[in-house]
């Protein structure tokens, strides 16, 4: 799972929407271990013949409180990671993961799934639109902050 999480960060860094720092992988590994210890599971892996193809990971409602104020819906989760290996993109793996995620979340009584996506990533916006997601807000930033003044 750490490899997939790092894959998202590395890919997003190509478009300027993530920054790789020396401690990034260590922090991601610790977060991954904590996520895998949660029961019931809130992360799902797609695989073929034992080979991992993709991952979807949401933060459970109690860990999604920081973003629940962005909507008036009831039980809310935050979709933290969605990643499919480059050779499998466009083959329906991501869509299958999201459909599975929605089915599980419906059964668990989740009302809303919120996520951030990399707008500069040419694959991200069309994918989430196809999955039925729509923007609620837009954020802007400048890097480095020193360039502001």
What do these predicted regions represent?
Residues 10-31:
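Conserved GNAT-fold acetyl-CoA-binding loop/helix
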Residues 30-44, 78:
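A short helix-loop-beta-strand connector motif used in the catalytic cores of GNAT acetyltransferases and
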Residues 40-56:
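Conserved beta-hairpin
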Residues 59, 67-86, 141:
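Conserved acetyl-CoA binding element of GNAT-fold acetyltransferases
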Residues 81-84, 90-107, 130:
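Conserved acetyl-CoA-binding loop-helix of GNAT-fold acetyltransferases
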Residues 95, 119-137:
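Conserved active-site alpha-helix within GNAT-family acetyltransferase domains
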Residues 105-117:
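Conserved GNAT acetyl-CoA-binding A-motif
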Residues 114-124, 141-146:
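Conserved beta-strand-loop-alpha-helix junction that forms the acyl-donor binding cleft
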